[in-house]
């Protein structure tokens, strides 16, 4: 196995909360997959959840080498959690297509947050 991509991103939670207050759920719908949006709707700390997902998807797009561009969208990345709470990243659409061309076999994702910031790192291995 070799590392074929590494990405990190940090998001300011307050900035995401302000974007939510300006645009409501439209901002969340732009970032979240359908399954993520269903979870989001049930939460009290929507801004914190969205900041963590935003950072994770930006980190994944950086690890892919495209950023959110070249046909890759936020909806190409879905974050879920296993039974122990470990974050899991699933690719679809253009991101999946590009990952297959790069022979990505393993995806590692870590997400963390504290009072003001959410941070995520993604590693793609062949």
Curated annotation (Swiss-Prot):
<keyword id="KW-0479">Metal-binding</keyword>
<dbReference type="GO" id="GO:0000287">
    <property type="term" value="F:magnesium ion binding"/>
</dbReference>
<dbReference type="InterPro" id="IPR037143">
    <property type="entry name" value="4-PPantetheinyl_Trfase_dom_sf"/>
</dbReference>
<keyword id="KW-0276">Fatty acid metabolism</keyword>
<feature type="binding site">
    <location>
        <position position="58"/>
    </location>
    <ligand>
        <name>Mg(2+)</name>
    </ligand>
</feature>
<protein>
    <recommendedName>
        <fullName>Holo-[acyl-carrier-protein] synthase</fullName>
        <ecNumber>2.7.8.7</ecNumber>
    </recommendedName>
</protein>
<dbReference type="Pfam" id="PF01648">
    <property type="entry name" value="ACPS"/>
</dbReference>
<keyword id="KW-0443">Lipid metabolism</keyword>
<comment type="function">
    <text>Transfers the 4'-phosphopantetheine moiety from coenzyme A to a Ser of acyl-carrier-protein.</text>
</comment>
<keyword id="KW-0460">Magnesium</keyword>
<dbReference type="InterPro" id="IPR008278">
    <property type="entry name" value="4-PPantetheinyl_Trfase_dom"/>
</dbReference>
<feature type="binding site">
    <location>
        <position position="9"/>
    </location>
    <ligand>
        <name>Mg(2+)</name>
    </ligand>
</feature>
<dbReference type="InterPro" id="IPR004568">
    <property type="entry name" value="Ppantetheine-prot_Trfase_dom"/>
</dbReference>
<keyword id="KW-0808">Transferase</keyword>
<keyword id="KW-0963">Cytoplasm</keyword>
<dbReference type="GO" id="GO:0006633">
    <property type="term" value="P:fatty acid biosynthetic process"/>
</dbReference>
<dbReference type="InterPro" id="IPR002582">
    <property type="entry name" value="ACPS"/>
</dbReference>
<dbReference type="GO" id="GO:0005737">
    <property type="term" value="C:cytoplasm"/>
</dbReference>
<comment type="similarity">
    <text>Belongs to the P-Pant transferase superfamily. AcpS family.</text>
</comment>
<dbReference type="GO" id="GO:0008897">
    <property type="term" value="F:holo-[acyl-carrier-protein] synthase activity"/>
</dbReference>
<keyword id="KW-0444">Lipid biosynthesis</keyword>
<keyword id="KW-0275">Fatty acid biosynthesis</keyword>
């Amino acid at each position: 196995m070799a590392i074929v991509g590494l990405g990190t991103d940090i998001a300011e939670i307050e900035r995401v909360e302000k974007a939510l207050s300006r645009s409501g759920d439209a901002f969340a719908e732009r970032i979240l997959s359908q399954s993520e949006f269903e979870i989001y709707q049930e939460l009290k700390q929507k801004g914190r959840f969205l900041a963590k997902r935003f950072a994770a998807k930006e980190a994944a797009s950086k690890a892919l080498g495209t950023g959110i561009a070249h046909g890759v969208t936020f909806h190409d990345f879905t974050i879920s959690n296993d039974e122990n709470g470990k974050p899991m990243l699933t690719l679809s659409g253009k991101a999946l297509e590009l990952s297959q061309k790069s022979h990505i076999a393993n995806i590692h994702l870590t997400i963390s947050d504290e009072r003001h910031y959410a941070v995520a790192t993604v590693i793609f291995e062949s």
